[in-house]
Amino acid sequence: METEPGEKKHLFTNKQLWALLVPVVVEQILNSLMGTADTMMVSNVGSAAISAVSLVDSINVLVIQVFAALAAGGTIICSQYMGQKNTKNATDAAKQLIFIITAIAVVLTVVCVVFQIPLLHLIFGKVEAEVMINSEIYFLYTALSFPFIAVFNAGSSVFRAQENTRLPMTISVISNIMNIVGNAILIFGFHMGVAGAALSTLISRIFCAIVVMYFLRSPKEEICVRDYTKIRPDRHKIKMILALGIPTGIENGMFQFGKLAIQSTVSTLGTAAIAAQAMTNILENLNGIAAIGIGIGLMNVVGECIGAGRKDEAIYYTKKMCLVSEVVIIISCLLVFALTKPIIHLGGMSAESGRMCFFMMTWITIIKPIVWVPAFIPAYSMRAAGDVKFSMILSCTTMWLCRVTLCVVLCRVFGFGPIAVWIGMFSDWTLRGIFYTLRFHGRKWLNHKVIE
């Protein structure tokens, strides 16, 4: 790659770096905002509908996390091959990613559709009849969308490995707009209720998959995948993808199970605490989403550095993006904190819920800029270098010790309110940050060999 005049030779110029990272950050922010708008529209259908959507989405998020993890494995392999300038192997890896992720998604869809009702009863137990009916409808449509989510994730990861992050962002934004417009038409126009929301989601996901596969066929792309029906499994490359994707998938899955355990504890604290925690979760997600986008983009950057044999560059860009992420986190935290009271007021929260929410956001705004970046950003680089098992073990250990166990003890034994959730979270972030910092400077994470 070219370098800017007077600069030390780096694989990426600042211009190239921002061109890669900014679309990923924008995509993450818009997806989060669109998701919030989507939830608000569904909430107008009624309490049974919003309860059903909330319950089913706890399953859907877990499935989507699995696809995202597999896609991340494909991104790492394709990025490293692109760093080697080995387009042929990058293309072969892309084909295998599309094959395996689609196959897994189809199997999941068949299982979820065939065993739809028993699965819902097994996971959620006894719920109100109306909620269960709505859950069955919503789950059916969303399960049908699994292959399309998987294909879009795979296609997007391949484009990101080619440093084209603008196309996945554009497709995602259009898809979210389609989903909201579809909700408006089907929910409010045709009065289809939860089925309208689910159908709109299915259509938007089909759109994503078709468009990303269409552009991936273009001969202009360095990684060009054509004749999808002729793709045959390559056990070696599939094993490479799964070796990276499965540990990340376990890590993401454990996070979702931990989240459910925390929700179960918070639900014992009363309605005001539940509402306060729900709003705090939304606001905390907003102040961190831009930095997460930087981390996702960093995986592609470090993957190329490792593939090119430039381990020094992997270290350089990790440090650089940690600094950028720190600035972004500080600005995001201050901005969201400034909007907290207006949002509490507009959300119609009770005085008690609003007070608890503001108290928790105050501490998040103080603590997050100090401990969040070292707890998460270096981990993206380590995964891109193939150091996925360390991340999985550390993340699962700190989550169950701090986020879950400490939270439960503080709530149930010492009578803490919802702030216990965030004490557990801060402890988790702090421990992660310490161990990731030691791992990063020890440089063992650079010794993994992902590709030949």
Q: What is each of the regions a protein language model found here?
A:
Residues A71, Y141-R160, P168-N176, A197-V212, ...:
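Short runs within selected transmembrane alpha-helices of multi-pass transporters and secretion channels
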Residues M1-V24, C78-S145, G189-I246, V302-K368, ...:
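Short alpha-helical transmembrane segments in multi-pass integral membrane proteins
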Residues A19-D38, Y141, S175, S204-C208, ...:
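Transmembrane helical elements of multi-pass membrane transporters/channels
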Residues V26, L30, M34, V63-F67, ...:
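Residue-level hotspots within pore-lining transmembrane alpha-helices
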Residues K9-M40, N44-V45, V61-G73, I77, ...:
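N-terminal transmembrane alpha-helices
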Residues I29, L33-S51, L120-A129, I185-M192, ...:
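Helix-terminus/linker motif at the lipid-water interface of multi-pass membrane proteins
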Residues S47-S58, S135, F139, A198, ...:
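Small-residue hotspots at the loop-to-helix junctions and early N-terminal turns
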Residues I50-V110, I149-P168, I274-T340, W372-C396, ...:
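Small-residue-rich hydrophobic transmembrane alpha-helices
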